[in-house]
């Protein structure tokens, strides 16, 4: 019998996606393969651009053209040959932020099983309020008969228990919140009189003659609002809709007249305007007078009274959704035993459909979350683990899982659960591709492929590959010293413990919010403070939902958020949140336009002899609106081809070859310091490092480019589209306008800035922090990366666990103090 050869590896030949330099590489199958390398070295190009693109495309190609035309399809990857690639699933680095209707329960699909449980297994209430014992008649779709009053009714289906469908609260529509008028916004300055415009809604949402009607209602309009009697203020805010006969004088036309007009109090003015809103522009005028409150009808549960009626083990659906997942699983497992014997087989099936996926989520450290938690309030790491759990719920075999930075948002103690899931996937006969920088998770790989040696045009090569010991011993490897622990990771001189607060203190006092208990927090001014803690311990709530909004409110002279009791931030005039959200969604935004270099270059080219000879102005050199933009692609650099039954194909514009400019733009040249010449399209095609050499004598341009180089972005080309940048690159580019300024009155807040950064890039990031600190800034960072934590002046460690088990400050101090604090889990990992 002929022996069949079973492929042992995916064979990639001559891959040239993005910056890959025609590489040949074999990726072992049935193993965890880590892909490492500095930012921009080609890791994602190999993992997502080749392996995932080909694995998913070939699977979709097996479907009928009728099915495929309804799907978004990937184009063929830029590679000569890929052999033995399995069907592929990718978990991207940054899952999209879900809408307001999405919760942890809907996102994980656990709520589907729970709703089915309540529909089929619960005690249902008859129209007269009597509860019936659980019955198999529900599953059979038969009517139920109330033994007490004889009423006949049908039990609600699972769909009728869904807040996104028939079970929605009629008042809030299943959102759980309602928009109401915020009284604090109606009279923002009570030192003004009503005649001077004290009542804000009457100025922007109502005719000016409402002041005259108010006067007719008996309110003095010529005294400061604060001096009005309580009765007069009540008329302004809630007065009755009485019709008044008034004389009015139109200041513009200088005409007078009289008319009958109904009084609209300040509150009703806003409510009336809200009811008439038809577009976003109208909403913008009204929303400054609104606040979001918990819906009074459903109390934030999103469900109608009927959907909250069924009871299972004594709890309603909304009460079960309020339990942390770890508790809920135990409660659900007790459901079959609480039912009549004939219902138990069905109950066990439904319970199993709930507990299987729930166990995965708990393995990934999400047991502290409740099913009713709004998905938009989850951190990136939590959303990514939700996505991972959903992808691995069905025990597949022979699938290639591509995980793009799964360690995002994970404390070192949470990575254990993640590695468990990866090993389970391998045990089931799958393959895992792991794009990551975290040495703790890379050590779990059976094989490492390292890309490099640098970023951008100088990357795209395989510089090392092999097992962990082989990589550690390979002198060409850049990740090897970090895997072996031999690299020096302390990169900055930290403040001494007794001088930490020498430049001042930021003090924040908060009441309970989500699972975070009331807190009193001190942060040293002019220092690098890192907020640490396991996932769900309250870092995001403390920094992004408390500190940042409180500072913004104080700077703008507004009231503090309701849960913030006090804030002492003397001398702070700016707070800047630098997160990893992509910069724009438009291909017209490039590194040069975002950094402000493009305008300077257009002006320089317009002053050149060539431009003057042709009569070109600076505006002509704009690839968005100028006369020199490419007419074929309108300055986008690419054209989209609509091929029926096949995916739309975006190709570089055949006219300008991706440069965005017409040929005439190539005739206008500037001369560099060494006598070389370049047109604006050629300059936009240079990376920052090369452009600095060419622009040495262009002072303003050179200064801006050197800041990008200082931020570790020297490998980006000036014409690179900003939406395509990684999270870490986007964060650093946002800082370009801040470096070099005096920042003593500024607080910079970073949300996991080490995302997507190789340990060598983390050292560049620490240099960026130091540049801000040298200019007097206060830097606050939410971070899990141990190298960043080690370099902090001050650490605030949240915990001890996630959810209800967290929400407290377990330790704070210098890294040495945290290491020696037995209560700190972070300290335990810092000591290693």
What kind of feature is each model-predicted range?
Residues 1-832:
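Conserved phosphate-binding elements of NTP-dependent enzyme cores
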